[in-house]
Swiss-Prot record:
The modification Phosphoserine is found at residues 338, 341. One of its GO terms (cellular component) is cytoplasm. A zinc finger (RING-type) spans 701-742. PANTHER family: NEURALIZED, NEURALIZED-LIKE PROTEIN 2. This is Protein neuralized. Involved in neurogenesis. Interacts with other neurogenic proteins in the specification of the neuroblast versus epidermoblast cell fate. It is found in: Nucleus. Keywords: Developmental protein, Differentiation, DNA-binding, Metal-binding, Neurogenesis, Nucleus, Phosphoprotein, Repeat, Zinc, Zinc-finger.
Length: 754
C-alpha cells in the first residue's frame, strides 16, 4: 500500500495537526516527514476497520456454510437410510413404538358403503352378506397421522379367492354416496385422492388382526398380529383430511374395528425385566416340577414372543435354554439318564446353531431323517444332510427326497427353519415309487405338477401348510388304507390324498415359495423292528399239541419264506395274529435273500394289520388280521396254536394249520381256527367279508345308480362311478372333482372284471 492508497480525509480531517499546506511543502520539518513515514508503515501493517469487518464476515459465513452443508448432508443421509430400511421392512417396530394420538374415539364404519355391506354392533362390525364385491367401506371420521387402525378378521369364507383391500382417501365419503364402484382396486385407486392395496391372502385368516397407519412422510406401514411387516403404500397426501377405506373382498366376509388403545395395551409384553430377577434364578435352570407351569404361563404369548422388542431376547433365550431341556427330561426320565442326556445335548446343539427346538411333537423318540443325495438344483444340504435350504434368489427347484422308503404308519415330521414372505406359495409334499438314485437333476421340473407326467408313480400335494412360519411342524403319515394325513403343529389331521400303499414309496418335499429351509424327523415306532436274516422259525413246543411237538424247529425254504417271527429268544408265544408284538429287541426275523435281504415287519399298536416291507425293494405286503373277537380262549387253547409264517406267495405256512387268503387285492387273511368254540365267530367274520366284497364288486355307480362301478379315478384312486359318469365328471360336470374326497380328477382308468 502506497501514499495513493491513503484515504483523502486522512490527511485533512482525521489529523488536523498533521495537515500540510502547499506553500509549506518545501519547508516542512524533517521530523514531520519521519513521523509521516512511521504512520504510513503502521497503516500498511494493520488493515482498515472495513477490511477487518469484511474478513470476519467472510470467515463466519464460510464456517456457517460448511457446518450447514455438513449438517444437511448428514441429515439427508440418515433420512435416506431410514427410508430405505422402512421401505424394505428392515425396521421392526411394535405397535407402541410409533407415538400416535390416544385421545380419539374408537373408529366406526361410515353410513356410506357398498350395496352388499351390513353394519352392526354399534357401527364396529361390517359384513358382506352376498357375492364377493360391492363391499367398500369407510371410517366414520377422518383419521390422524400415526393413528393406528386395528381390523379383526371376524368372518372368513373358503368360497372365493383374494383378501381385503385397504388404504386411505382424501375424499369425504358423503360425496361418494350412490356412486361407489364394485372394487376399490383399481376402480377407486384410478381416481385422484384414493390410495389402496390388496393384503396377501395368507394373512386373511379368522381372528387375525391387521393394523396399519400413515406417517407424516405419506408411507403406510402395516402389520399382522402385533408383528410389523413393512411399508405397503407410499405417496399419501397428508396435507388434507384422510379417511380409511377397506374393501371387504374375496374370502374375507366380515371385519371388525378394534379400539387401538385397548389392543396396544393388551399386546404389551408382561415379561419381568432381567434386572428384577434374583441372581440365583438367573443362573440356575428351573426345576422339572415347575417346568410345566413355566411353559403354561408363556404358552398364551408364544405367537407374540416372536415379535417382542430386543430387550426381551434374553428372556426368550433363557426360556429355551432352561425350560425346554427340563421339559424334555420329564418324559425321558423312565428311559434312563443316557437317553435324556442325548436329547438335551441335541436341543443344546440346535440352540447353538440357531435352530428352533421341537415344541409340538416333542413326545416320543424322534430321529433325524437324512435327505437323499438327489435333490433340486437350487437346494443346498448340510454336511450331515439333515437340513435342506433353498437359495434365496430362487423360488423353485427345491426338491429333496428321503434317503430310504417310508413305512406304513410311520410318522414323519417336517420342521420349517426359515421363511421368506417375498414369494408366494409354500411347501409341497409328494410320494413316489421312483428310486431317487435313478433320477438326474434335469429330470426334476420347476413345477411339481409336471412330475405326474413321468412313467413312475407320483402323487403331489401343494401348499400343505398355509403360510408356514419359522418353527412350524408339519407331520404326515401313510395309513394302511392308503390315506395320507397331515397335521400342522399337532393339530387335527386332515387327509390330503390317497396312495397305493402296496408300492415301495419315497417321500419328497418341494421347498417352494415362502419356505426357505427345513429339516425332517421320524418318530421311532416301538413295534417296528428290523431283523437280521436268519432262515429258520422256532415254534414253541407244548405237551398238549402233538403236531407242535413234532415240529419244534422247522426250516423254511429260501424261495418260500418272505418273513416270519422267531420268538425263541424271548420264550414267549404269539398269542394271536391280532396280538402280535415284539417283546424284546432280541427277537429275530427269518428272512430269505441272505444278509442283504433283511426285511422290516411292522405291527401297529392297534393290532389290525401286519406289514412286511423289504428294505432292498419290492412290493409291500399288508395283511389285515382278524378281529380279536374271533380269537379262541387264550387260557384254554393257547398251546394248540402254532406260529404262522407269511410267505411270498400269500399263503401262511405253519406247523400244523394253514390260513386262507381271502383276496389278493385286499390281502385280507383268515386263519382257520382249531378250537370248535371259535368256528362260529370266524365263520361269521369270513361270511361278512365275503358279503362285503361281493357287495363292493357289484356296487352301483354313486351318480346314476344303474351301471356297476368300472372305473378308477386318478390320482385319488377312488372307485365310485361307472366309466360314463366318471368321464362326465372329469370333463367338468360337478367341478371335475372326486365326489368322495373332492380331489381333482386328472385321469379316468377303466377296469374290467372276469
Amino acid at each position: 500500500m502506497g501514499l495513493s492508497d491513503i484515504p483523502a480525509n486522512y490527511m485533512q480531517g482525521s489529523h488536523p495537526h498533521l495537515t500540510l499546506h502547499p506553500q509549506q511543502q518545501h519547508h516542512q520539518n524533517q521530523q514531520h516527514l519521519q513521523h509521516l513515514q512511521q504512520m504510513q508503515q503502521l497503516h500498511n501493517a494493520m488493515p482498515t476497520p472495513a477490511q477487518q469487518a469484511a474478513q470476519v464476515l467472510a470467515m463466519e459465513s464460510n464456517e456457517l456454510l460448511m457446518s450447514t452443508k455438513d449438517k444437511l448432508s448428514s441429515k439427508k443421509k440418515m433420512h435416506l437410510l431410514k427410508k430405505i430400511k422402512k421401505r424394505f421392512g428392515l425396521v421392526r417396530r411394535s405397535p407402541s413404538s410409533c407415538p400416535g394420538p390416544n385421545n380419539l374415539p374408537p373408529l366406526q364404519f361410515h353410513s356410506v358403503h357398498g350395496d352388499n355391506i351390513r353394519i352392526s354392533r354399534d357401527g364396529t362390525l361390517a359384513r358382506r352378506f352376498e357375492s364377493f364385491c360391492r363391499a367398500i367401506t369407510f371410517s366414520a371420521r377422518p383419521v390422524r397421522i400415526n393413528e393406528r387402525i386395528c381390523v379383526k378378521f371376524a368372518e372368513i369364507s373358503n368360497n372365493w379367492n383374494g383378501g381385503i383391500r385397504f388404504g386411505f382417501t382424501s375424499n369425504d365419503p358423503v360425496t361418494l354416496e350412490g356412486t361407489l364402484p364394485k372394487y376399490a382396486c383399481p376402480d377407486l385407486t384410478n381416481r385422484p385422492g384414493f390410495w389402496a392395496k390388496a393384503l396377501h391372502e395368507q394373512y386373511c385368516e379368522k381372528d387375525n388382526i391387521l393394523y396399519y397407519y400413515v406417517n407424516g412422510a405419506g408411507d403406510v406401514i402395516y402389520g399382522i398380529n402385533n408383528e410389523e411387516k413393512g411399508v405397503i403404500l407410499t405417496g399419501i397426501d397428508t396435507r388434507s383430511l384422510l379417511w380409511t377405506v377397506i374393501d371387504i373382498y374375496g374370502n374375507c366376509t366380515g371385519i371388525e374395528f378394534l379400539d387401538s388403545r385397548i389392543y396396544m395395551y393388551q399386546q404389551q409384553p408382561a415379561a419381568i425385566p432381567m434386572a428384577t430377577v434374583p441372581a440365583q434364578q438367573q443362573q440356575m435352570p428351573q426345576p422339572a416340577a415347575n417346568a410345566s407351569s413355566a411353559l403354561n404361563s408363556h404358552h398364551p404369548h408364544q405367537q407374540s414372543r416372536r415379535s417382542l422388542p430386543g430387550h426381551t431376547a434374553a428372556i426368550e433365550h433363557d426360556l429355551e435354554r432352561h425350560v425346554m431341556p427340563s421339559l424334555q427330561s420329564l418324559h425321558l426320565a423312565g428311559n434312563g439318564g443316557s437317553v435324556a442326556s442325548v436329547e438335551q445335548a441335541a436341543i443344546a446343539h440346535d440352540l447353538a446353531n440357531g435352530l428352533p427346538p421341537l415344541r409340538y411333537n416333542a413326545n416320543g423318540r424322534l430321529i433325524p431323517v437324512p435327505f437323499h443325495n438327489t435333490k433340486g438344483r437350487n437346494v443346498r444340504l448340510s454336511q450331515d444332510r439333515f437340513v435342506a435350504s433353498r437359495t434365496e434368489s430362487d423360488f423353485c427347484q427345491g426338491y429333496v427326497f428321503t434317503a430310504r422308503p417310508i413305512r406304513i404308519g410311520e410318522k414323519l415330521i417336517v420342521q420349517v427353519l426359515k421363511t421368506e414372505q417375498m414369494y408366494v406359495g409354500a411347501l409341497a409334499l409328494g410320494l413316489t415309487s421312483c428310486n431317487p438314485a435313478m433320477l438326474q437333476p434335469n429330470d426334476l421340473p420347476n413345477d411339481s405338477d409336471f412330475l405326474l407326467d413321468r412313467p413312475e408313480y407320483w402323487v403331489v400335494s401343494k401348499d400343505i401348510a398355509a403360510a408356514p412360519q419359522r418353527g412350524d411342524e408339519i407331520a404326515f403319515f401313510v395309513a394302511p388304507n392308503g390315506e395320507v394325513s397331515i397335521s400342522k403343529n399337532n393339530g387335527p389331521a386332515v387327509v390330503v390324498m390317497h396312495v397305493d400303499q402296496s408300492l415301495q414309496l419315497w417321500a419328497f418335499l418341494d421347498v417352494y415359495g415362502s419356505t426357505q429351509s427345513l429339516r425332517m424327523f421320524r418318530q421311532q415306532l416301538p413295534n417296528m423292528v428290523a431283523y437280521p436274516s436268519q432262515p429258520q422259525v422256532n415254534v414253541n413246543a407244548s405237551s398238549s399239541s402233538a403236531c407242535n411237538a413234532a415240529s419244534t424247529s422247522r426250516m423254511l425254504p429260501m424261495t418260500e419264506s418272505m418273513s416270519s417271527l422267531n420268538a425263541g429268544a424271548t420264550a414267549k408265544l404269539l398269542h394271536h395274529p391280532s396280538q402280535l408284538s415284539v417283546a424284546q429287541s432280541t427277537s429275530t426275523l427269518a428272512s430269505a435273500g441272505g444278509v442283504n435281504g433283511s426285511r422290516m415287519i411292522s405291527m401297529p399298536s392297534n393290532g389290525d394289520i401286519l406289514q412286511i416291507q423289504p428294505n432292498g425293494g419290492g412290493t409291500v405286503l399288508v395283511v389285515n388280521l382278524p378281529p380279536a373277537s374271533s380269537s379262541h380262549d387264550i387260557n384254554g387253547q393257547l398251546a394248540a396254536r402254532p406260529t404262522a409264517t407269511v410267505t411270498s406267495s400269500g399263503v401262511l405256512a405253519g406247523a400244523c394249520s394253514s390260513g386262507t387268503l381271502i383276496s389278493t387285492t385286499s390281502s385280507q387273511y383268515i386263519e382257520q381256527p382249531i378250537a370248535n368254540s371259535t368256528n362260529n365267530a370266524a365263520n361269521k367274520w369270513k361270511d361278512s367279508l365275503s358279503d362285503q366284497q361281493s357287495t363292493d364288486s357289484s356296487a352301483e355307480c354313486t351318480i346314476c345308480y344303474e351301471n356297476p362301478i368300472d372305473s378308477v379315478l386318478y390320482m385319488c384312486g377312488h372307485m365310485c362311478m361307472c366309466y360314463d359318469c366318471a368321464i362326465e365328471q372329469w370333463r367338468g360336470v360337478g367341478g371335475g372333482q372326486c365326489p368322495l374326497c373332492r380331489a381333482v380328477i386328472r385321469d379316468v382308468i377303466r377296469t374290467y372284471t372276469t
